[in-house]
């Protein structure tokens, strides 16, 4: 295609940064997550990046059972590439974050290239009321939380997923993460 650059569109359907009080459109239940992923594929997304949420309170979760509730629906409806998170949420340890990828062995998984600070506390002044009791502390306490992704953590994720033949979407949030990607 002369003069045209092919693109690959990825849709991150729910993520782990936002809380249910931030938007009534945040998919939380398995049905909502599946519907949004399928709609994204129908709109042209080649890849859907997926997190799970506790359907009772919208809290980010890496419980494989929650992923099991929406993955079959998506796979049955379309041939979009499934990209499961290994990032989970900033409050989770590496072993917890790995659970869905080890269980479902996706074609693609995200892989953060370094530790970072998610200063979510700055969003507090945008909201006066929260739907769930976990949301305010989740945001408030982010001023003293590190989203850990050390070289050892990254090597562990790569090693743990080697048998799966999972490929990785490399997530770089700053220039140092590019150097880490080059290292691996």
Name these PLM-found stretches.
Residues 9-13, 48-50, 80-86, 107-111, ...:
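Hydrophobic faces of well-ordered beta-strands that scaffold small-molecule active sites
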Residues 21, 46-69:
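Glycine-rich, proline-tolerant flexible connector loops at the mouths of alpha/beta enzymes
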Residues 33, 40, 51, 109, ...:
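Conserved, mostly hydrophobic/aromatic
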Residues 87-91, 99-178, 182-184:
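Conserved anion-binding
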Residues 13-34, 86-94, 143-148:
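Active-site mouth loops of central-metabolism enzymes
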Residues 11, 59-84, 157, 161-163:
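Alpha-helix-loop-beta-strand connector modules within alpha/beta enzyme cores
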Residues 1-25, 128-134:
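N-terminal small/glycine-rich loop or linker at the start of catalytic domains
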């Amino acid at each position: 295609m002369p003069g045209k650059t092919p693109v690959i569109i990825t849709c991150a359907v729910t993520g782990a940064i936002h809380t249910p009080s931030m938007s009534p459109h945040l998919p939380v239940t398995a049905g909502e997550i599946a519907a949004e992923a399928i709609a994204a594929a129908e709109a042209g997304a080649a890849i859907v990046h997926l997190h799970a949420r506790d359907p009772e309170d919208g809290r980010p979760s890496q419980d494989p059972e929650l992923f099991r509730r929406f993955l079959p629906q998506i796979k049955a409806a379309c041939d979009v590439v499934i990209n499961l998170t290994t990032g989970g949420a900033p409050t989770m340890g590496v072993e917890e974050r790995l659970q869905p990828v080890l269980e479902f062995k996706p074609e693609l998984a995200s892989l953060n290239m370094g530790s970072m600070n998610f200063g979510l506390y700055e969003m507090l002044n945008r909201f006066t009321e929260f739907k769930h009791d976990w949301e305010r502390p989740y945001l408030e306490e982010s001023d003293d939380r590190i989203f850990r992704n050390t070289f050892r953590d990254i090597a562990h994720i790569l090693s743990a997923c080697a048998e799966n033949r999972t490929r990785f979407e490399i997530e770089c949030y700053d220039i140092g993460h590019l150097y880490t990607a080059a290292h691996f």
